[in-house]
Amino acid sequence: CALPIFLLGALIVTLLFRRDSKLNSAARQMQEFIGDASHELKTPLTVIRGYSEMLTSNPNKVSEYSARINSESIRMTNIIDKLLKIAALDETNPLQTREIELSDYLQKYVNDLKILQPNRPVKLQANPLQITTDLEVLDTLISNLISNARIHSPIDAPIHLSLEGRNLIIEDGGPGLKVIPDKPFQRFDQSRSRESGGSGLGMSLIQKSAKQLGVKMEFGKSELGGLKVSITF
């Protein structure tokens, strides 16, 4: 009789340990996220405050300083928008799926890039592929991956999108993002992200949207010189 009681006790201890481990992991991730978000919001707020104070002592610079304040306000709004998107990407929310032609869908991003940065070589190589997906979550995934490629590479560096079977590959001419092989989503070079005008929150959106869609992602070095991201649908 003692053996079953012992086994039951061991099972309870194991379950409690697993629960606590999951809670600790979630708490750690939340703490890191809040720390990163606070840091990102603090930077534009500091700039806004600095230029606001200089306005009182140097009224001749009103136009220049006001433009800088407006620029940082827009940046802060974009950061807040990303934070709201991250909060909205709840894995428990059911996906609103529909069937789309992926090659046609990707073409709009190529067209946008050519308008935004006409000097950048942009190429799409894709065969037709029908997939069933949540379009809003997919938009979050693809737009942030392309935004990372655009922000973290020179304006004349190439960005290539290719669709091979059910694999979508997005790569850029670099230097791209720093890849951490064992934990590709955690702690990308965020200081460099801020220097390039990014918020450092894009990878959180990519991670959450990829997980919600159930797609497999791999990161590596592109032959173009930058980052290569492979997504399997």
Could you say what each language-model-derived stretch is?
Residues 96-114, 127:
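A conserved beta-strand-to-alpha-helix junction within the catalytic ATP-binding
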Residues 177-189:
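Short conserved segment of the HATPase_c
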Residues 71-76:
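Short alpha-helical segment of the dimerization/phosphotransfer core of two-component systems
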Residues 50-60, 64:
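Conserved C-terminal segment of the DHp
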